[in-house]
Amino acid sequence: MRYKMGRVLTACSVVMVLLVSWNMGSVRASSLPHRVFILHSYEAGHVCGQPQHDGVVAALRKAGFKEEENLEIEAYFMDTKRKNNTPELIDEQARLALGKIRDFRPSVLVTLDDNAFRTVALQLVDSDIPVVFSGMNGQPEDYNQKTPWLESRPHPGHNITGVYEKLHIADALKIHSRLLPGVKKVWVFVDPSPTGRAISKQIKLEMEQESVPCSWEMKIATTWEEYQKEIRSANADPEAGAIYPAALLLKDGEGHSYTAPDILAWTVQNSKKPEIALNYAFTRMGLFGGAAVDFHAMGSQAGQMAALVLKGGAPGAIPIEDAQRYALVFNLNRSKELGIQIPADILMAADDIVSAKP
């Protein structure tokens, strides 16, 4: 009898140990940190990428996902503007990024800007890695023609969702025309890179959808020298009331690359027209300003989507959104250089006023 009782107690002990072990494993699994991989198209600290990154992290924190508590973040910078800007180098960066992503095994991948989405996210369609994009300039439907990943913007339907970078250029021209009522024409400058072509299409689409109080002319600068020549031509055009510099990658005759900091610094030194800023942060680089894309807010939108995925939501059921917010920002030092007096009511409505030189 004692022998049988001992066997029963031993069996019960084994069951208890197994139950406790299973329960501890469940607790351990639930407390494991969520893993978010943020893939940048550009270099660390880039004027477009870094604000989006910060917005993603801030939104995750607000949703309860905090580093060193329940969140692990890894980032990789493809550096496809300044350094790795040929098709071969971009493809090599995509290969390296995919390897790092698969090793990290993220709960969600966040891609910032088009090159990361185009070369990496589209290779992960219908994989077990959820993807949230931010800063997409290309049309989602155009990417879908290359690799099917999208049923519709309201219901993407696969494992990808995100934020389309609406430029709000029509709003920018309306505000500038109110600021300077005599504006007849705005010169828009773009470059022929993949992102530049996408921005060109965005501008045309947005202008078709809304009426603006002035005319506009698009110039595609294929080289650094051509860009310089076109800026000087705009200076000489009496009808040009402003320029919209959206050429962010140019090469000179010797193959040297010029990116946003180089291009905008030269523009501020040589342009005689107020510059409408595409990016909120461009005013801190010396541009006049106006209504500009708020990249931090756009990243925050993407971060909110990533938080939904971490909480169990399916990316395919989360609607793709336009970047909702533009910021009204002005550089007072630049306005003084140009001899422009910004009305008090517009300054009071501004989200930010920059007074320091870049």
PLM-predicted stretches and their roles:
Residues 2-12, 22-358:
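Short hydrophobic alpha-helices and adjacent helix-cap/hinge residues
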